[in-house]
């Protein structure tokens, strides 16, 4: 099978990217604000709402993020239209034919517009790799479900020029999911 390779390109030294990464509309809504390679803010919304596994991003968390800095770019942790394709295939019509779970619509309440949508498993791979001390590694991502993928294996390497390659070596797609089986057994 042919898998996609993703490459990050470093910006010139005088350009410090300011990125707000958001995850919401499912369990564990969270955010991370990066200025260059420095984490300015990282948090889960359940710390603000006192609701375990809270799926909603709330104004108190957004206000707290703004105290730590601004951003030039907003990334969302999955590709919503790809996810809707899987939901349509699975017969989850109420999820497919609503706009409330589209990030572009959902984030209007905070006056935020997503600039970039990242594949769900690539989001996991990047988060695990960039918070590790390694310059080369294999990443194994297993969860209930991303857009379609339920498990992926990546070869990840940062090169001398500062670029990082994420090469997907294997993936398993819905409905086959170790994570969904785990959720069914643990009722989580």
Model-based region annotation:
Residues 1-188:
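Short acidic/glycine-rich loops and adjacent helix/strand connectors
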């Amino acid at each position: 099978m042919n898998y996609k390779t993703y490459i990050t390109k470093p910006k010139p030294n005088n350009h410090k990217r300011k990125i707000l990464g958001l995850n919401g509309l499912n369990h564990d809504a969270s955010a991370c604000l990066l200025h260059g390679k420095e984490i300015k803010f990282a948090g889960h919304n359940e710390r603000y709402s006192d609701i375990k596994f809270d799926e909603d991003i709330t104004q108190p968390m957004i206000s707290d993020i703004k105290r730590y800095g601004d951003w030039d770019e907003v990334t969302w942790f999955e590709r919503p239209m790809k996810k809707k394709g899987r939901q349509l295939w699975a017969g989850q019509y109420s999820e497919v034919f609503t706009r409330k779970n589209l990030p572009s619509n959902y984030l209007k309440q905070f006056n935020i517009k997503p600039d970039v949508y990242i594949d769900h498993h690539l989001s996991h791979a990047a988060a695990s790799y960039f918070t590790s001390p390694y310059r080369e590694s294999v990443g194994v991502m297993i969860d209930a479900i991303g857009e379609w993928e339920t498990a992926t294996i990546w070869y990840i390497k940062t090169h001398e020029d500062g670029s990082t390659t994420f090469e997907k070596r294997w993936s398993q797609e819905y409905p086959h999911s170790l994570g969904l089986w785990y959720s069914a057994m643990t009722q989580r």
